[in-house]
A protein has these predicted regions:
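Short, Gly/Pro- and small/polar-rich lid/capping loops
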Residues: 2-42
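Adenosine-phosphate binding glycine-rich loop
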Residues: 2-6, 205-206, 261-411
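Glycine-rich, N-terminal phosphate-binding loop and its surrounding beta-alpha-beta segment
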Residues: 41-113
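Glycine/serine-rich phosphate-binding loop and adjoining beta1-alpha1 elements at the start
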Residues: 76, 95-222, 406-407
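Hydrophobic Val/Ile/Leu positions in short beta-strands of Rossmann-like dinucleotide-binding domains
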Residues: 226-228
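Glycine-rich Rossmann-fold phosphate-binding loop(s) that bind the pyrophosphate
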Residues: 230-232
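N-terminal Rossmann-fold NAD(P) dinucleotide-binding loop
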Residues: 235-236
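NAD(P)-binding Rossmann-fold cofactor-contacting core
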Residues: 245-259
Length: 411
C-alpha cells in the first residue's frame, strides 16, 4: 500500500523547487514555509430533531507577514488539518504573487452539507463564527474569510451578521468577510471572479506566440478547444467566458464521467496536481498554468470588496458622473471637428461612466495580465527555464522576502 500523499508536503515540495533557484537564507525560507497558527475546534449543535452532533472545524493562518490574513471556508466531509494548512499556504503565495496585501489563511468545517437542513447549516455557521471570534481568528484587520467549496454568499452573510452582533463598536465590521451578497456590502462581479480570472489567465498564456509555438499551436484563443472538469461556480464561468472568446468546448466533465485532453491544462482548482505529476507533465512538454496564478481572481476581487467595506463607498460613486461629462465633452469636440453627428442614444452609450462591476472587472484583468508578465519574466531569468508553477513560486517568494526585508526583521 502506497504512503499517503500529504497536501501540505506537496505545497512545500513546490516551494523548495522554486527556492533552489534563489539565494535567500535557509532560516528565512523555513519561516515562510511554516504555518504560523492552526485552530482546531469541536462544538455541539442541536439538529432539527433535537439530537446533538459534535462538529469539527479548523482555521489555519499560514503567514502574518501581511495583515489581515485571507482565505475561504469550505464545507466538506473530507476537511482535515493538513488540507487547511496546505490551502492557507497556497493563499499566502497566491496573494504575494498577485500583489494583494494579505497573508494566507483557510478554514473548513467537516460536514457533508447534504445531510443538514438550512436551519442546521445556519446554526453551524454562526457557531463557527463565534468560535473564531472568541479566539481572535476573524476581523477586518485580523483574518477575513470568504466562500470556498460548499459555501457561498448566504453563508458569508451569516458570518457577517454574527460578527456584527459580536463586534458592535467596529465601524468596519462588514469587512470581516468577503463574498457577501451585494445588499450586505458585497461587490458586483465577485461571484464570477474566479472563473473570469481563469479565462484571463488562459488568454494571457495563449497570447504568447513563443510559448504556443513550443506546443505546436497558434497564438490566441480563437479556434482552440477546451474540456472543463467540474461545472461548479468556477468551471461554469470559465467555460462561459472561454466560449464567448471563440474557444470550442468539446467536453464538460462532472462526477458521472470525465474526458481528458493530453495537451492543454489550466488549474482552476487548488492543488490538483502533485509535485511529481507536475514535473512529469513539464518533461512531456505539457504547459500547466498553475493554480496559484490561475484561480487568483477570487481573492483579487475579494480584496476589492474588502477595500469597499473599509472605505464605505461603492466603486464608481465618486467618479462616474465626472467621467460621463468629460466623455460627452470629448464627443462633442469630435463631432465639431469631423462634422459627423451622433444621436443622443449613441452619445449616452459612448459617454457612460463605469459602473462598479466594470471597475472590478478592469482591476481583475489588470491583475491577471501583469501577474502573468511577472511569471514569464521570472522564468526567463534562468538558463534552465523553470516551469510556470516554479516561476510563480519564485515571484511569490521574492515578494515575501522583500516584505520581511522592509520590516527589518530578516536580511
Amino acid at each position: 500500500m502506497s504512503a499517503e500523499i500529504k497536501f501540505f508536503d506537496q505545497v512545500n515540495a513546490h516551494f523548495d523547487r522554486a527556492a533552489a533557484f534563489l539565494d535567500h537564507p535557509k532560516g528565512l525560507l523555513e519561516q515562510i514555509k511554516t504555518c504560523n497558527s492552526v485552530y482546531h475546534m469541536a462544538f455541539p449543535i442541536e439538529k432539527d430533531d433535537g439530537t446533538i452532533e459534535v462538529i469539527h472545524a479548523w482555521r489555519a493562518e499560514h503567514s502574518q507577514h501581511k495583515l489581515p490574513t485571507k482565505g475561504g471556508i469550505r464545507y466538506d466531509h473530507r476537511v482535515n488539518e493538513d488540507e487547511v494548512m496546505a490551502l492557507s499556504a497556497l493563499m499566502t503565495y497566491k496573494c504575494a504573487m498577485v500583489e494583494v496585501p494579505f497573508g494566507g489563511a483557510k478554514g473548513g468545517i467537516r460536514i457533508d452539507r447534504r445531510n443538514f437542513s438550512e436551519a442546521e447549516l445556519e446554526r453551524i455557521t454562526r457557531r463557527y463564527t463565534y468560535e473564531l471570534f472568541r479566539k481572535g481568528f476573524i476581523g477586518p484587520a485580523v483574518d477575513v474569510p470568504a466562500p470556498d467549496y460548499g459555501t457561498g454568499p448566504k453563508e458569508m452573510s451569516w458570518i457577517a451578521d454574527t460578527y456584527l452582533a459580536l463586534a458592535q463598536t467596529d465601524v468596519n465590521a462588514l469587512g470581516c468577510v468577503t463574498g457577501k451578497p451585494v445588499a450586505q456590502g458585497g461587490v458586483r462581479g465577485r461571484k464570477e471572479a474566479t472563473g473570469r480570472g481563469v479565462y484571463f489567465g488562459i488568454r494571457e498564456a495563449c497570447a504568447s506566440a513563443a510559448d504556443m509555438k513550443k506546443l505546436g499551436l497558434a497564438a490566441g484563443l480563437a479556434g482552440k478547444t477546451a474540456v472543463v472538469q467540474g461545472l461548479g461556480n468556477v468551471g461554469y464561468y470559465a467555460a462561459r467566458f472561454l466560449a464567448d472568446a471563440g474557444v470550442k468546448l468539446v467536453g464538460l466533465a462532472e462526477r458521472e464521467g470525465s474526458i481528458a485532453n493530453p495537451a492543454i491544462i489550466g488549474e482552476g482548482a487548488n492543488g490538483p496536481v502533485t509535485a511529481e505529476a507536475s514535473d512529469r507533465l513539464y518533461r512531456r512538454g505539457v504547459m500547466v498554468i498553475p493554480d496559484m496564478y490561475l484561480n487568483a481572481g477570487g481573492v483579487t476581487v475579494s480584496y476589492f470588496e474588502w477595500l469597499k467595506n473599509l472605505s464605505h463607498v461603492r466603486f464608481g460613486r465618486m467618479e462616474k458622473r465626472l467621467e460621463e461629462r468629460t466623455n460627452r465633452s470629448l464627443l462633442e469636440v469630435v463631432q465639431k471637428l469631423t462634422g459627423k453627428g451622433l444621436s443622443e442614444a449613441e452619445i449616452r452609450a459612448y459617454s457612460t461612466g463605469p459602473e462598479e462591476e466594470d471597475l472590478v472587472n478592469s482591476g481583475l484583468e489588470e491583475t491577471m495580465v501583469t501577474s502573468y508578465e511577472k511569471i514569464r519574466a521570472a522564468r526567463s531569468r534562468f538558463r534552465e527555464e523553470p516551469d510556470l508553477r516554479t516561476a510563480a513560486f519564485i515571484v511569490a517568494i521574492e515578494m515575501i522576502c522583500g516584505t520581511y526585508g522592509d520590516m527589518g526583521i530578516f536580511p
